[in-house]
């Protein structure tokens, strides 16, 4: 089963995370037409990268906003719209959760350090070999898709530790979505659409743990949902 992964600079861990649960990878980039991009894939993985343009959610640009790629935004907005129209499974990671939320009608905190009073450090700058270093705790909401996927790996307090490399976050949650995890400072760590086959966005980087498997259930869940697409009569 092929999973479409949006092109980004650091794609290898995403690729490995999908392949290690038995999936095949197809890299999607803005040079593709929409028909070609989605042809033959059973699910979509939205990857990390630069900031989403604030113009997408009707706000002036904060001075901290960096690496905006209008072409990528345009491509991913079209991907998200078509994937949701088809009810293709979606897993959105870091920038991906932000793109998913904004494309579906939500907004973002443009800069956590200056816009979230009392915020934890979320934008850890680490060398490649430390991308799996755990940064802070998060709490999962009960009876959500995320909690069900991670249930066997959670502590008794329904919490787990995650890595963290972001300065933006979901602010207003898109209509139809719900929060499924938060950091102790209230920053949203995951959202999902309970009406979809599988539509989950996470703010941390679970793909960095493909060797050790802490977040393997997220990728297994995506692949299982993608396989159900092809079995649909």
Question: Positions of the model-derived regions?
Answer:
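N-terminal beta1-alpha1 cap of cysteine-dependent amidohydrolase-like domains
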Residues: 1-91, 101-109, 113-161, 167, ...
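Conserved G/P- and acidic residue-centered "switch" motifs that form tight phosphate/ATP-binding loops
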Residues: 94
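The feature captures the ABC ATPase H-loop/switch
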Residues: 97
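Residue-level marker for buried hydrophobic side chains located in beta-strands
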Residues: 200-202
């Amino acid at each position: 089963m092929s999973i479409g992964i949006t092109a980004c600079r650091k794609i290898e861990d995403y690729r490995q995370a999908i392949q290690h649960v038995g999936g095949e990878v197809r890299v999607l980039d803005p040079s593709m037409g929409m028909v070609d991009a989605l042809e033959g894939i059973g699910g979509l993985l939205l990857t990390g990268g630069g900031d989403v343009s604030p113009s997408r959610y009707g706000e002036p640009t904060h001075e901290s906003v960096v690496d905006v790629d209008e072409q990528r935004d345009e491509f991913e907005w079209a991907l998200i719209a078509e994937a949701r129209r088809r009810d293709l499974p979606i897993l959105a990671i870091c920038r991906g959760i932000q793109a998913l939320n904004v494309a579906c009608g939500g907004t973002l905190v443009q800069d956590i350090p200056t816009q979230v009073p009392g915020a934890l450090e979320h934008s850890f700058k680490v060398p490649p070999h430390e991308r799996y270093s755990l940064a802070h705790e998060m709490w999962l909401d009960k009876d959500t898709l995320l909690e069900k996927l991670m249930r066997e790996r959670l502590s008794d307090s329904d919490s787990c530790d995650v890595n963290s490399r972001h300065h933006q976050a979901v602010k207003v949650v898109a209509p139809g979505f719900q929060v499924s995890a938060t950091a102790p400072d209230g920053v949203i760590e995951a959202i999902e659409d309970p009406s979809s086959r599988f539509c989950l966005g996470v703010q941390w980087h679970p793909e960095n743990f493909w060797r050790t498997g802490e977040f393997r259930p997220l990728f297994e869940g995506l692949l299982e949902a993608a396989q159900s697409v092809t079995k649909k009569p």
